[in-house]
């Protein structure tokens, strides 16, 4: 196993000419990034394509990056990640599927899961607490892939098929922003798309599941929910749309006020079009950000109305725990914006 390390070999661009402007940081990357984890006010990690991972401990002023090579000599394409009590974890999406972890501030990988099934495609990871997590993937052999760990990611087991809802014809999930898995305590939501788009909900940490049909656009391979965010166990938003018709802004944003039992459409024909990532502000309950390759949009009223902030292309958005910073990542770029956005 070889790991290539880079320290500070990134291009940093600061802008903001007036004191009232937001501090703006752009970082040029050697990879595409669809998964971001903000571990603290200044600590951010990303998981990217071709084995690339990186972190900053000082709010983006300096970066360490590494290109992880798996034991079989491949560089996994990482599109999902998350952190437990003592480790950060990255998920390689396709066959051979790999999961690796490293200590919270380290860059050296430990490989904890491997699967060579040619149909394997892992989409997202979510941590329920410091020891328990789920990884969701597309169906193989007529059964969704759901991996679970209860020891901080040291070991992973596949949940038996008879405990999961059966996939519908043409139903899958999107590894677009590590956004189609969400949790609040032991309540977990999985969002699917394609020919069918559903919410799969568990209230007992993944032991039993119920299926809820969604009112969002669906019926073709690149439609449905791409990302969801919950501010508590009852209130959440699910967003996506039609990747092939990104300007279509109907049927792409739904809200629940009862923990996912029912969903209603929001901002029909008035909000942004296709977006791959939606996140809520950690301290402002009605503030939302949605981003995608067509731009960045903001709502301050729970998603009923939206303002287009910029045409800047990103795949994933994450807030810092204190809500003072918004991090964005996409194709060979990473951006930091101060909140509130200007």
Where are these regions (language model features)?
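Residue-level hotspots at or immediately adjacent to binding/recognition sites across diverse folds
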Residues: 19-342
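Bacterial Sec-dependent signal peptides at the C-terminal "C-region" and cleavage site
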Residues: 8-21
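Positively charged n-region of N-terminal signal peptides that target proteins for export
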Residues: 1-4
